[in-house]
Design a protein with these regions (language model features):
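Glycine- and small/polar-enriched repetitive beta-structure motifs of secreted/surface proteins
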Residues: 1-255
Length: 255
């Protein structure tokens, strides 16, 4: 008794079954696209195996081969790109609100919610992590359990990786900003290569191209301006409390 359904391709929507009159507005295009949907509505699934495990899930968009291919009961997801959100799987009805656009973007997400990934391999290792934004190729690409990170730019926070659930509150915006950060938290790094050598360092602010670009383990530094504190480098964990504001400000400071 389902109405307003479009199914194109081998096995597309072949298990959909409404026993009462229902306007489904489901669209499935591709071999086995939406093949397991039973009573879900308002889904748009385009591509081979797109959303093929979804059952009673609603308001999903999956475009691309094996996009959103594992999930059964997750709703309100947008997966555009080959294998985008390919392993997301909610075993209970959940509004995930995950958005992944790009080849394998958010590919490893299982039960994380409210993440936004735009770019090839963006956030592709995250599993049960929430409230992240990764925009740019390989942005936030290594992390598994870090939450509340913002990485915008090619390779931003590329090596950040928390293996236990952690709210990182890291913000990195710019080409390879915070590129080497592993387990540092609460860093704000804005500008091309800003803080790009920092690893397990915390509470830093680097704003400007190449600001704080050499330091690995210094914490609590503020560098604002192009190349500010760009020679500072502490190889052991150190609270520096250095502040440099201006073009090349403190550029000769090392330790």
């Amino acid at each position: 008794l389902g109405s307003h359904t479009t199914a194109i391709g081998y096995g597309a929507l072949n298990t959909q079954n409404f026993t009462t009159a229902t306007d489904t507005y489901n669209t499935a295009v591709g071999s086995l696209a939406g093949a397991s949907v039973t009573t879900g509505i308002l889904n748009t699934l385009i591509g081979g195996l797109a959303g093929d495990a979804l059952t009673d899930a609603d308001h999903n968009v999956a475009i691309g081969y094996q996009s959103l291919t594992t999930d059964t009961l997750g709703s309100r997801a947008i997966a555009i790109g080959r294998e985008a959100l390919g392993t997301q799987n909610f075993a209970t009805a959940t509004n995930g609100y995950n958005v992944a656009v790009g080849m394998q973007a958010g590919k490893a997400v299982t039960t994380g919610v409210q993440n936004t990934f735009v770019g090839a391999l963006a956030g592709d290792a995250l599993t049960d992590a929430d409230f992240n934004v990764a925009i740019g190729m390989q942005a936030l690409t290594a992390d598994t359990l870090g939450s509340r990170s913002i990485a915008i730019g090619h390779g931003a926070l590329e090596t950040q990786n928390f293996t236990t659930a952690t709210d990182s509150y890291n913000v990195a915006m710019g080409f390879k900003a915070g590129n080497a950060v592993t387990t540092g938290v609460e860093n704000t790094l804005i500008g091309g290569l800003a803080g790009d050598a920092l690893t397990d360092a915390d509470y830093n602010v680097a704003i400007g191209s190449e600001a704080l670009s050499s330091d690995t383990l210094g914490s609590r530094s503020t560098a604002i301006g192009r190349a500010a504190l760009n020679s500072q480098n502490f190889t052991t964990a150190t609270n520096t409390h250095n502040t440099a504001v201006g073009f090349n400000a403190g550029s000769n400071v090392t330790t």
